[in-house]
Amino acid sequence: MMRETGRRLLGIGARARFAAYSLFEKKSSGDSNFAPGAEKYILKSPDGALEVTVSDGRLTYSAAVGKTPVIEPSEIGLLVQGGVNLGENAVLGEPKTDSREEVRRDPDTETDITDRHINYIFPVRSKKFRYSLEVRIWNDGFGFRLLFGKDTGLLISDELTRFNVPGDTVCRYQTDLKKMQGKTLTQKTSELSQSEVFSCMTAFEFPGKSIYIMITESDIENYPGMALRSLGAGRFKTELWDTDKFFIKGGKTPWRIVTVCRSLEELVHCRVITHAAAPISDKIYENADWIRPGKSAWSYFIDEEHSRRFEKIMEFNALAQEAGYEYNLADNGWRDWAKTERGAFKKVKELVDDAEKRSVGIWLWQSAMDKVWFTPYRRRFFKKCQTLGIKGIKLDHIESETQFMTEFYRRFAREAAEHKLMVIYHNPQKPTGLRRTFPNVMSMEAIRGLQCKADADNDTILPFTRMLGGNADYTPLCFSVPRCLNEVSICHMLASAVIYNSAFFTVSEDPSILKAHGLDSFVSPLPVIWNETHVLTGSKIGEIVIFARRSGNRWYAAVFNGSQSERKINLPFSFLKDSAKYEAEIYTDNLTDQRGYNKVKITVTSADSADIAMRPSGGFAAVFREI
């Protein structure tokens, strides 16, 4: 219902507004000076290893690493009114080139990261129409988009851009376009079927060549989201899956992104999606000390009825305080605390007052299917939340990528920031770099998390696919609910809390249960900011993940075993600081009891290692505290 509403609104707007604009009547400024350039341009990354070729005629691009093609010649096209394809009969002008190296603070690692890229802007003439093609190349990927003059009006009926991937690769994809919670499937690219539609963040591995690519998008503004329609044998077409015709005036298309990494270590550090997003430009984010990462207690996952019981959420205030969590999330059901919304908000005020005494902040759930669509109600809602002392909003049930909805993500985040409210999105679109533009967007779901039950096989893929988009609200650790634990071990669950990062970290297990099982000493001090991350030797997509991560002077190690068989590995502690001693708190699988685990504390140095035996779908977790 929500998606169809968006389509109707967009259709009316497009017809009403388009009457004022003509596709061909206006030419961009300086058009008379357009000078054709070469028929083909070979563009290089800053390190020279990645080459992107752009050709005119039928506008196409391709890419290669060394002598290995990673994208074969593929069309860039946009179908507008009158059946005109802007990529046909295209003539490229000489590009403007800009090399940049920008250093900025990353809020999720609290370190400086470098955005080093070369940017090319080509003027393009296509019949009587003028626009620009922007191509940006990083060492670990590239993107392209179309730019239009401010007076250009377009009624877009389809995007014809393609991504042709070599068939001798392995494809990893899922087909849940609404929520990105589908099971990740693995198949030879040459054997992919025709007409199936994949979500973005579809990834490809080049066997024997240590090359990994992923196709997605970034920086969506006034444009619907895309998916990938398989045409068979590694050929894909952009699919604007959640919209019909739509109108834009001026502006730009989203970045069409291809990440290109040459190791798993490089892959998990790839920031291309974030780099491509528009930087912060709003003064409301200056001195934003109200944006505070942290862990949150969450009663809903253990029992959905908990959120409807005011006394239970009050109890979780105390549990959050005892566990050292920064937040407590009141999920779906809080409006049942009274007969009216006004009465429910009075109860929320009681909850907030109690939480403040305990140095705990309250987050509040809100459905996108509710009245927040309407600007007056949404603004009153935000104002009320700020007045009550709410710290953040969990917006749920989105499940759409219409032009209206992708704009709603941005509008909701900005208006929330005006009231000093953080945000997470559930059942949302793919991650597209929103956190860079709107730093109060702490996380989003868009992942097959614990809600869909633990999946050891999937867990050995997602750190190398979905996590390239940034924070994911996986909601880890709920082992007391059998359907969530599924076949994985307790140590696999602990590892998920280390490997999946989220600035708003929702702990789905009851803190009292964690304490009763002796796991609070690991979970309570668990950081949500990781200053350093490494993929360790032995990791293999779809089989095993071995991570080492540092926060301050503490190191963590975590392992996912994706196999249905026991697995033994030797884990060197060489990631630790040389000449330092650490107290290691180590958690290993009980090989005969899925719900059991072994815990030891020993003193180690970087010269030491551990022999680890894991259950089928098992895992390993350890924390190293410098002494």
Predicted features and spans:
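An acidic-aromatic substrate-binding cleft motif
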Residues: 251-327
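Aromatic- and carboxylate-enriched substrate-binding clefts and catalytic-loop regions
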Residues: 332-489
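Carbohydrate-binding surface patches
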Residues: 540-578, 620-621
